[in-house]
Amino acid sequence: MELIIILLALGLLMFTAYRGFSVILFAPICALFAVLLTDPSHVLPFFSSIFMEKMAGFIKLYFPVFLLGAIFGKVVEMAGLAASIAKTIVRLVGAKRAILAIVLMGAVLTYSGVSLFVVVFAVYPFAKNMFQEANIPKRLIPGTIALGAFTFTMDALPGTPQIQNVIPTSFFKTDIYAAPWLGLMGAVIVLAAGMLYLESRRKKAQASGEGYGGFDSQNAPAPESIESAAEPDKSPIRHALAFVPLILVGAVNKYFTIYLPKWYPNGFDFSSIGLKEFGRLDISSAAAIWSVEIALVIGIITTILFDWRSVFAQLKEGLNEGIGGALLASMNTGAEYGFGGIIAALPGFHKLSSGISHTFTDPLVNGAVTTTALAGITGSASGGMGIALSAMSEQYLQAIQAYNIPPEVMHRVISMASGGMDTLPHNGAVITLLAVTGLTHRQSYRDIFAITLIKTAAVFAVIAIYSLTGLV
């Protein structure tokens, strides 16, 4: 019965999200419905101490990132960078390769350490312009951004600084370059299969006469796109400079990620300036977020300098729109985190995670299935991985020693598995992506789910490759 309660709450949230209802309202309703069926007396304590704590904690940490990311994306659009870069890339790779261009743009940003939430805000203006230029249906944008930002650069490519690749290092005493060949092969599988799928969807839409805005827009881009954006100078230098803010965001983020902890080697003690009530701040936990925020501020300033007249002409409307988008996206994602927190606290969840973890004898398969299942249930790659490793890491270490499996292989498998079924309809990144693009689950989730299946299958392909070749 306890398992049925969890599945019922999860199914209800997926259904309401798919039907277009706001998860800000339905995430707590679905979560508390599960608590009500478990023990009615726990409803109010769970709401105050778990749901609201999780939601508020997420917003406290990440709202500045959402806000600056949304403003950066909007300023990029207002300054004409989106139109300029879109035209340049279309000219280089061809209009028919707009999908590949957006995938690679998202991949470069996430691999450079930019948060995938920021990538959604930053890449969407480019995707919108490029898809309009190539007359590719807008409904394919979420799947395209998902392939570039939510898959191989998040957890497969060795060296990626995303949290899904960092968490296993503390459990398996590895580094972020663990199992490089397996990671590279997994990345190639996801990229190749994902591109084949998205291109097949593009060709099918083209054959049926569907354009950017649907079946009534077979001709040129929508009027609000490239023609109405600030028209960039036609000189090659001007086009090249349009890439500078995007590159700066990645480079500055990397720089401050390395050097901020060195500037505060002992953290920051507020009592040293007479503010004892705030205690000591652990810089290691804040440096990653600070780095992104600084990088985005520099990116915004650089973008404004690119064409300050165009930006200031639309500044009020653009800022208001960006702030509104950031509020909606952060509240949506925070509500989903609160839902995951309540589900993870229910008695049925512990039975479920324990049951899954004891189903498979092979430690790699066991770890992959457990992690991806928990990521799917909680709607969070890092959340599912954290729960799996906190409960099972010692058992996994003993098992891989018994099977003579290097810990680096387990690291890569667990990392990739966390990014498997995490992108179900209630996932925060999915909800943010759809909110930013102005699309619904009904319009675009099919393609996101196809990418979800591809990246989940890639984990087991990597396990098979290791089992057959022993390659690490």
Swiss-Prot record:
Keyword annotations: Cell membrane, Membrane, Transmembrane, Transmembrane helix, Transport
Superkingdom as given in the UniProt entry: Bacteria
Any single Gene Ontology cellular-component annotation: plasma membrane
Region (Disordered): 209-229
Residue pairs linked by disulfide bridges in the UniProt entry: none
Composition bias type Low complexity, residue spans: 220-229
Single GO MF descriptor: gluconate transmembrane transporter activity
Membrane topology: Multi-pass membrane protein
InterPro entries: Glcn_transporter
Transmembrane segments: 4-24, 27-47, 56-76, 99-119, 140-160, 176-196, 240-260, 286-306, 323-343, 372-392, 448-468
Localization, UniProt: Cell membrane
UniProt cross-references to PANTHER family, sorted A to Z: BLL7963 PROTEIN, GNT FAMILY GLUCONATE TRANSPORTER
Family in the record: Belongs to the CitM (TC 2.A.11) transporter family.
Protein's recorded name: Uncharacterized transporter YxjC
Organism classification: Bacteria, Bacillati, Bacillota, Bacilli, Bacillales
Underlying gene: yxjC
